[in-house]
UniProtKB/Swiss-Prot annotation:
Pathways per UniProt: Amino-acid biosynthesis; L-leucine biosynthesis; L-leucine from 3-methyl-2-oxobutanoate: step 2/4
The species this protein was found in: Geobacter sulfurreducens (strain ATCC 51573 / DSM 12127 / PCA)
Gene that produces this protein: leuC
EC primary class: lyase
Molecular function GO terms recorded: 3-isopropylmalate dehydratase activity; 4 iron, 4 sulfur cluster binding; metal ion binding
Annotated residues for binding of [4Fe-4S] cluster: 308, 368, 371
Protein name, UniProt field: 3-isopropylmalate dehydratase large subunit
């Protein structure tokens, strides 16, 4: 009987099986940021265990509230900063070099097919786009990961999501994943790996695959995952060229990390996206979705473009194509947060930042701040935001605020009209 990619990764990293169905895995990468990691650091220090298993396998960044907005967030940042220096963690990204973790770390080439990756952040599943098993974990597991380089997981069960057909104009990866979550629900993949397959995934860029995998957690998934292919190799090639003689050699090595044809899945779900419309959320859960045609005209106060879901260069290009030569509505605040310094610089070189600013957008430094209602775009009570982020929980971007999740294209069209709008009319 064949194995899924998740089963192969588990088998290759297995250290112990203390209980039936519980696997202790060796970790390839432990990621850390300044919101959750200081809690783990403080507990390890209190127990006299202030050490790390391997400083080369720990990647740390200050990204959630940066630069710090007050003494509390400054203290959190300092704690992570001091810890990284104390333990010789070279891959630490401080103010000026920092970006949103789930965009920055792939950009740095830290992820490979077949890797095991953890972080005290629920959207760690993003990195499954590279054919890795990547999962968000709690403080206790993070402490063990930092200290021992291992983490315990349940035996993986996989739901195969076949995405077939071809994407219509104006429809993107964000629309696809919102559609999938709308179909299966916020608990539809609880404790499962969501394996994304099909012709649509095959033709997606790595940026789009990261958008898909990023929101696996919004359906309850432990991780999202895609099969590594030449798209993966091309993205990683600047970091692989000293390890492999050719791209073809790298692809051959990565082909080990693909699900077998006779692998057994808990479920197989088929989606034909050929007639899919742009999708927008309407409530306080990511599975409350509607086609844009059914919600168009809803007024908004703010449009936010950024985050680990849709703050990459591809996303900025899509939105800028719609915004070029236009102005946002006078009733709307437009905020753009490129996800990393490199994305920001590349967008400047391409003239994208000029397009956003001429349209009336405020452009901030790379940060997660607005997404979780902490800085750089917090909503007032009763305000409504059209956002390219990944969560629309009540008060997520500010107490009493409402969030409509959508693609960068839909957010750009919405900014122009001051109300939720169909981007296809601008393409």
């Amino acid at each position: 009987m064949g194995k899924t990619i998740a089963e192969k990764i588990f088998a290759s990293h297995l250290v112990d099986e203390p209980f039936a169905g519980t696997k202790v895995l060796r970790l390839d990468v432990v990621m850390c940021h300044e919101i959750t990691t200081p809690i783990a650091i403080a507990d390890l220090m209190a127990r006299g265990k202030d050490r790390v298993f391997d400083p080369t396998k720990i990647k740390a960044v200050i990204d959630h509230v940066t630069p710090s907005k007050d003494s509390k967030t400054a203290t959190q940042a300092k704690m992570l900063r001091d810890w990284a220096r104390r333990h010789g963690i070279v891959d630490f990204f401080d103010v000026g070099a920092n970006g949103v973790c789930h965009a920055l770390f792939p950009e740095k080439g830290f992820i490979r097919p077949g890797y095991t990756v953890i972080m005290g952040d629920s959207h760690t599943c993003t990195h499954g786009a590279f054919g890795a098993f990547a999962a968000g974990i709690g403080t206790t597991d993070l402490e063990v990961g930092i200290l021992k380089g291992v983490c315990a997981f349940r035996e993986p069960k996989t739901i195969r999501i076949n995405l077939n057909g071809s994407l219509p104009e104006g429809v993107y990866a964000k629309d696809v994943i919102l559609h999938v979550i709308g179909r299966i629900g916020v608990n539809g993949a609880t404790d499962r790996v969501m394996e994304f397959r099909g012709s649509v995934v095959d033709t997606m860029t790595m940026e789009s695959r990261m958008t898909l995998c990023n929101m696996a957690i919004e359906a309850g998934g432990t991780s999202g995952i895609c099969m590594p292919d030449m798209v993966t190799v091309d993205y990683l090639w600047p970091f692989l060229k000293d390890e492999y003689q050719s791209r073809e050699a790298a692809l051959a090595a990565f082909s080990l990390w693909r699900s077998d044809e006779d692998a057994v899945y808990e479920q197989v779900l088929d989606f034909d996206v050929s007639s899919l419309e742009p999708i927008v959320t309407f409530g306080y859960k990511p599975d409350q979705v509607k086609p844009v045609s059914e919600i168009a005209g809803t007024p908004v106060d703010q449009v936010y473009l950024g985050s680990c879901t849709n703050g990459r260069l591809e996303d900025l290009r899509i939105a800028a194509r719609i915004l070029k030569g236009k102005k946002i509505a006078p009733t709307v605040r437009g905020i753009l947060s490129p996800a990393t310094p490199k994305i920001y610089q590349d967008a400047m070189r391409e003239g994208l930042i000029d397009i956003f600013m001429e349209a009336g957008f405020c452009v901030t430094n790379p940060t997660c701040g607005a997404c979780l209602g902490m800085s750089n775009g917090v909503l007032a009570e009763g305000e409504v935001c059209a956002s390219t982020t990944n969560r629309n929980f009540m008060g997520r971007m500010g107490k009493g605020g409402m969030v409509h999740l959508m693609s960068p294209a839909t957010s750009a069209a919405t900014a122009i009209e001051g109300k939720i709008a169909d981007p296809r009319k601008y393409l």
